[in-house]
Amino acid sequence: MHLAVLSCLMQCNSSSWYAQQRGLSSPEYHLNVLKRLYSVNNEALRICSGAFKSSPISSLQAECNEIPPQLRHQQLALQYAIKLKANRENPAYDDIFHGDDPLADYESDASSSSEGKAESSDEEYRNTLKEKRKSLPPTFCGRLQEVATDCEVPFDLISHQGIPDVEPWLVRVPSIDYRLAVLPKAKTNPHQYKALYKEVVEFYGNYSHVYTDGSKKDEKVGSAAVWLDTTRKTRLPNGCSIFTAEASALIDALKLISESDTTRFIIFTDSLSCLQAIENEDMSNTLIHTYLSDYTELVSNGKEVVMCWIPSHIGIEGNEKADAAAKSSLDDDITPMSVPYSDFLPKVREYFHNLWQGWWERRTDFLALIHPILNKKIYDPTLSRREQRALCRIRIGHSRLTHAHIMDKHAEKPMCAECNCRLSMKHIMVDCPKYQHERSSFLDGSTTEEIYNNSDRAIINFVKECGFLNLL
């Protein structure tokens, strides 16, 4: 319910967040809207996790692996712009990428109508425009520029998803041999694969062999296609996916075929996902679209091309050559080319996750001490709802036992009767000598990090033995 309804409402209010951050466009109104929305969102996180009412919002978000809405709004805006860049026919395209001044048209019309007026009137008019700009929120384009620059998104490399060059009913799909893909790679001996590969070679005895492969190391991406002694390599833009590398290699293979006088070819590739995308005629991917268009043209020119999947790194000579060529292309200069917009979406998600991680590292929450790296916490599925709720409160450090006084201004802070010190979850779990016997029976370690690193079941058993489960 939270993800399906509340998160969507929060995301739709991203413009209010931008305006409030910049102090523009009735900030009091936007601040009130955000407070109401954030309050509902925070309450939903508390209900989902079972956290106590006084739990810090940052800890709630970290425990639920819910990125703060301020960052989420920016992430969604940038992802939308990346998708829009691939669709230039979208009516919003020009406004998003070229509409950086909300008063540009107004200024142009007014200036043309004010020709012949006194210079003092022009100066007064310009001052009026400046004041209007201060009261207006920045446009989507203006807000986006700073975020896109920080994230280093190469908008100029995003390929255009236009209308296909070839009519859909004229597109030809190659024949694909999947006989080697039937066997599970993890359980199949390489010699068995090689035997099946020889059967394929014999079956297509009069076909020339082309081998393709893609390679990725850190941010560097490359691809290669090998036919006899001819190799065609491509160094792709940094950050491209391995799928894009494999698809680029297949396109290079068709280029090798088009330059040859030989008629029959079989392309061997170890990318099952690319073959399936080609078979399904996935025109949403610009590289698959290009491959099918090039293949259709080759077939119309009298070429015969079939494809076959082979496993990688089992000693097939042609595949090993293609793999070596693809790896060597990583040291080449980047080839100017456009790539699908989807390749840059993971980079955006990683950028904002790292930004959130930086925020989290500066927090002093108790959860930040035991959970310094942000990732999804998966509770032991055998725990009951009550036990999961208790575990969440133990991890965040806020519970009814230790923080109920915050809800009642007349209540006093709870004290440990054994140690005469402030009662806290850390004191119960780590320090209090009263529970040393139970601690040594159920938990391993002596430091806070070591004790909280025990299994969920062990921590719950310790709390049960101490008699605190129903008090949290």
Q: What are the residue ranges of the model-derived segments?
A:
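RNase H-like, metal-dependent ribonuclease domains
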Residues: 23-431, 438-472
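Basic, alpha-helical interaction scaffolds
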Residues: 1-19
